[in-house]
Design a protein with these regions (language model features):
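Short alpha-helix boundary/capping motifs
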Residues: 1-2, 69
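Conserved GTP-binding G-domain of TRAFAC-class P-loop NTPases and closely related GTPase folds
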Residues: 2-5, 10, 14-18, 77-133
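Conserved substrate/cofactor phosphate-moiety recognition/catalytic segment
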Residues: 6-56, 92-97
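Glycine-rich phosphate-binding loop used to anchor ATP phosphates in small-molecule kinases
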Residues: 37-90
Length: 133
């Protein structure tokens, strides 16, 4: 509901980024069904695919929920190995819950949330559903 997938889709369609996210591994026939036993594998596939795309010279956007800072380590490592530049975007909008994640799960993630340290924040901007804003 923070706008991660929406923002990643925009970058993919408008600027040619490869859009990756662990949530895509939990979609079956258009329905999102999270399986915590497959979460680590889904994130590992995203890191692998991001690294491959970066090695091929592609721009990559990863729309994952990294609740704890250490959860970004795979993407950070892949970016460093590929010799690419990394930019973090912290989405804070309310775009609705497109994956129907239970409210209790969202509340638990918010309670564990570690915001990006100030040194990782390059810019702040607002992305809205209305293209006139």
């Amino acid at each position: 509901g923070s706008g991660k997938s929406t923002f990643a889709t925009l970058l993919s369609h408008s600027h040619g980024f490869v859009h990756l996210e662990a949530d895509s591994h939990f979609m079956t026939n258009g329905k999102y069904t999270f399986d915590p036993l497959r979460a680590a594998d889904a994130h590992a596939v995203v890191v692998r695919d991001a690294f491959s795309a970066m090695q091929a010279g592609r721009k990559v956007v990863v729309a994952n929920t990294h609740v704890r800072l250490w959860e970004m380590s795979g993407i950070v490592g892949a970016t460093q190995l590929a010799g690419r530049t990394l930019c973090f975007v912290e989405c804070a909008a309310n775009w609705g819950n497109i994956h129907d994640v239970p409210q209790a799960a969202l509340d638990a993630m918010r309670a564990r949330w570690e915001p990006l340290p100030a040194e990782f924040r390059a810019i702040a901007f607002r992305l809205t559903a209305n293209s006139d804003e």
